[in-house]
Amino acid sequence: MAIKKSELYSSLWASCDELRGGMDASQYKDYVLTMLFVKYISDKYKNDPFGAITVPQGATFDDMVALIGNPEIGDKINKEILNPIKEANKLNEFPDFNDETKLGKGKDLVDTVSNLVRIFNDDALDFSANSAEGDDILGDAYEYLMRHFATESGKSKGQFYTPAEVSRVLAKVIGISPKNATNQTTAYDLTCGSGSLLLKVANESGKDITLSGQEKETTTANLARMNMILHNSPTAEIVADNTLTRPAYKE
């Protein structure tokens, strides 16, 4: 049975409400999307040695659930779950789940992080049971949240999200299509944000093209990398660095 988008969105916004008091949208988006990412890759790949992403033993969402109520839950999520996932998949830094300035101190932090895990510990959000293997429900949810986070934070969507309509038009403007794209075709975005434009170009190509991007903000670059994985483009290369002073791609 496929997961209903309404159920997924409801859970995501419940997690936003849990975090909303201590930080603004530009900050809590990282926690929500990280939790979504860990839940998704755990359900999809934890028992798949040939999966698109490696989920180390002891670093699954189930291991997060086992930490609910633990006085050291924030520190343990950082060290025992997120760090192993980061190292195994060459990701950038995840948000700090033990940050007292954002999540509260002592029992407040434990309760906030525990409740965040509980929200995603829902049978309705079992991604391993999603019958539509090719359905982009996670990618759609990711972009849905990006749009709303931009609105909530009062910042331009362009900071970390290119609207789907704009991405689609730009992908068509450059003229890429199944007729002229091959498996040797490459696409590069020098200010890729969350990677939405790259993904639209890949979609327009109709082929397994090579995707590359560079993004100055480390957190946003990590969101782009996660976005690539959620959209079945795990081989995309995203560099976190300043394009103007240290361009990673010069050819």
Q: Could you say what each language-model-derived stretch is?
A:
Residues 156-251:
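Conserved S-adenosyl-L-methionine
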Residues 1-178, 239-248:
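Non-catalytic, mostly N-terminal accessory regions of nucleic-acid modification and defense proteins
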